[in-house]
Amino acid sequence: MASGKTTGKTDAPAPVIKLGGPKPPKVGSSGNASWFQALKAKKLNSPPPKFEGSGVPDNENLKLSQQHGYWRRQARYKPGKGGRKSVPDAWYFYYTGTGPAADLNWGYSQDGIVWVSAKGADTKSRSNQGTRDPDKFDQYPLRFSDGGPDGNFRWDFIPINRGRSGRSTAASSAASSRAPSRDGSRGRRSGAEDDLIARAAKIIQDQQKKGSRITKAKADEMAHRRYCKRTIPPGYKVDQVFGPRTKCKEGNFGDDKMNEEGIKDGRVTAMLNLVPSSHACLFGSRVTPKLQPDGLHLRFEFTTVVSRDDPQFDNYVKICDQCVDGVGTRPKDDEPRPKSRPNSRPATRTSSPAPRQQPQKKEKKSKKQDDEVDKALTSDEERNNAQLEFDDEPKVINWGESALGENEL
């Protein structure tokens, strides 16, 4: 069956917005770029790179038999007086059967091509890894566990454990013949905080500190693209992007605090752990199409189940209680509370009257018994009891380690 390319506008998803980091170089047409960052020659007219090890970048997602490909030279220029000026070449890695030299078999001699393979790789096979679309995916950091290129080349260091939407700014550094191993990069992942909301807020803050900031024009584009593809930029309220919060119909998630703070509210990032991905929504939902006068309406019904055994079950229930049909309300810990009295000032029943407590229905005590209990309290116990009546409830919720997966945010 013959197939042809469609022309004109498509209904493809909007490009992913990258919050920080260097803009990936585009090699050839869109969607034909290397998955990895470039090797950069230190001088003009440097010879092709030679590697201490196999020369294949580390990629744990591939089997050993698929670890082969080629490095391709890319001439670079920069504008100068009287025209463009040559700068040292860049070399990009592609798997065999992909990229600009996709039609070449492994080992075919050609100027500007260096073939590499890991020990045990099947160089007769062709990769199905494809190439990268720079508008949707960032470059993957280069790592060589068995030895990198010779001293004529360098590459920008990018942390290997960065999140996709939180790229750190690449700091240019001279590359030694052996780069940090993957085990070392795993070790840097172990310092996670226990509080899920605090972790979520920290991720957002780090994204804003590292790399380039979102421009006003980019933020406006994020907030006003097609409704189903919108995301809330930093500094925007929820209702600026998705309209006013409602009750008992679409748009009913979010209380007043969440609406005002937008993505700064850690509960947003926490609940995103339960929101289906695009693929899960499409293939795991009950999809109901309906033709209306204004167009085709698609309804997606999806259920996420949080087990009662989940350590974060109570926390998710609490957020839902606060935010579902939450318009016009605020969390209790966000409301102003009476200030605690300092411990240095002794509090007594006469100087610091405590609010009257409701008597328990199950235990009925006579007034005489109550008087005897009061007399039995020491002065320190009286002071502590009075103080506790005015203490604020703790605002920090211990979410635990298991609430947040390594790649969920």
From Swiss-Prot:
Keywords, alphabetical: ADP-ribosylation, Disulfide bond, Host Golgi apparatus, Phosphoprotein, Ribonucleoprotein, RNA-binding, Transcription, Transcription regulation, Viral nucleoprotein, Virion
PTM comment: the record says: ADP-ribosylated. The ADP-ribosylation is retained in the virion during infection.
Molecular function (GO) terms listed?
RNA binding
State the disulfide connectivity. 320-323
On this chain, the residues bearing Phosphoserine are: 190, 379
Query: Primary place of residence?
Result: virion
Q: Where is the CoV N NTD domain?
A: 31-156
Point to the regions of Polar residues compositional bias.
341-355
Sites bearing Phosphothreonine, chain numbering: 378
The Low complexity compositionally biased stretches are 15-31, 164-179
Subcellular location per UniProt equals: Virion; Host endoplasmic reticulum-Golgi intermediate compartment; Host Golgi apparatus
What are the boundaries of the region RNA-binding? 29-160
Region (Disordered), start-end ranges:
1-32, 44-63, 120-145, 164-193, 327-409
Identify the GO cellular component terms for this protein.
Answer: host cell endoplasmic reticulum-Golgi intermediate compartment; host cell Golgi apparatus; ribonucleoprotein complex; viral nucleocapsid
What sequence ranges are listed for the domain CoV N CTD? 215-331
Q: Where is this region: Dimerization?
A: 226-333
Subunit info? Answer: Homooligomer. Both monomeric and oligomeric forms interact with RNA. Interacts with protein M. Interacts with NSP3; this interaction serves to tether the genome to the newly translated replicase-transcriptase complex at a very early stage of infection.
Q: Which family does it belong to?
A: Belongs to the gammacoronavirus nucleocapsid protein family.
Functionally, this protein is described as follows: Packages the positive strand viral genome RNA into a helical ribonucleocapsid (RNP) and plays a fundamental role during virion assembly through its interactions with the viral genome and membrane protein M. Plays an important role in enhancing the efficiency of subgenomic viral RNA transcription as well as viral replication.
Q: What is this protein called?
A: Nucleoprotein
Q: Which organism is it from?
A: Avian infectious bronchitis virus (strain D1466)
Gene symbol here is N
